[in-house]
Every structure is written in structure tokens, then in C-alpha cells.
């Protein structure tokens, strides 16, 4: 029985782009964005290493931002709000706001990844890209 049919280069770019753009689903649903690249990964992992790499990268980035960003944001505000009454918390507000902005910056990063992959470029998330490449090589 023949193996899976490889994707065309155009289809590879399209599915990689969709994986990265799925970060925008988080704006509407709050947390369902990582499911899309995970589904794309399992559907196309045997047909395209390019799509597998970008979908797994997008999934892990979104998961890390969702869990890590949510935890850090909650912690930052849990520390800042009580300290505001001691005036020390006023110094914490800029840091809490910066941490709160990180998930929104991740949206921009995901869109940037979508643009890069739609043009056929090899986009890599900082730290995550090399880790995923190692996972797929093993």
C-alpha cells in the first residue's frame, strides 16, 4: 500500500500559515487557538515536515503563552493590587501591565509567523523553534 501523498509547496505554505494564524482564534474563544495547530499537526505530520514543524511550533507557543502568560498575569496582579494600599504597589503597576501585554504581543508574533510562512520562509519562534526541530528529528 502506498504511503501518504506529499503536499504541494503551495499547500504546505497554506497549512503552515493557518497554524500560525490560529493564534487569532484566542481573541474570540479565549483558549481554543492551540487546538487548531494540534489538529493540523496530526493530519499532516506524515505528509509534510514543513507543516508538522510549523504546526507543532504554533501549538507549543500558544500553549506556553496561554498557561505561562495567564499564570504570570494573575500572579503579577495578585501581588500588585494589595501592595497598592502600601504605595509600593504603584511601582509594580508598570510591570503588571507589561506582563498583561505579553499575550497580546504573542498574537502579533503569530501573525508575523503566518506572513513569513505564507511567503515560504522558514519562520522560527525564539527558543521554541529549535526545541521543536529537535523533537521532530528524534
Tell me what each language-model feature is.
Residues 1-64, 112-138:
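Membrane-interface extramembranous regions at the lipid-water interface
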Residues 16-36, 59-110:
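Hydrophobic alpha-helical transmembrane segments in multi-pass membrane proteins
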Amino acid at each position: 500500500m502506498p504511503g501518504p501523498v506529499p503536499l504541494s509547496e503551495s499547500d504546505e505554505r497554506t497549512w503552515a500559515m493557518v497554524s500560525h494564524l490560529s493564534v487569532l482564534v484566542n481573541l474570540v474563544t479565549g483558549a481554543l487557538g492551540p487546538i487548531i495547530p494540534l489538529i493540523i499537526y496530526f493530519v499532516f505530520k506524515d505528509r509534510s515536515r514543513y507543516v508538522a514543524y510549523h504546526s507543532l511550533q504554533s501549538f507549543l507557543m500558544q500553549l506556553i503563552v496561554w498557561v505561562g502568560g495567564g499564570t504570570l498575569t494573575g500572579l503579577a496582579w495578585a501581588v500588585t493590587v494589595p501592595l497598592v494600599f502600601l504605595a509600593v504597589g504603584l511601582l509594580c503597576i508598570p510591570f503588571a501591565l507589561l506582563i498583561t501585554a505579553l499575550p497580546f504581543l504573542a498574537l502579533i508574533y503569530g501573525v508575523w509567523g503566518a506572513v513569513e510562512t505564507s511567503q515560504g520562509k522558514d519562520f522560527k519562534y525564539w527558543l521554541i523553534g529549535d526545541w521543536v526541530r529537535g523533537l521532530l528529528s528524534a
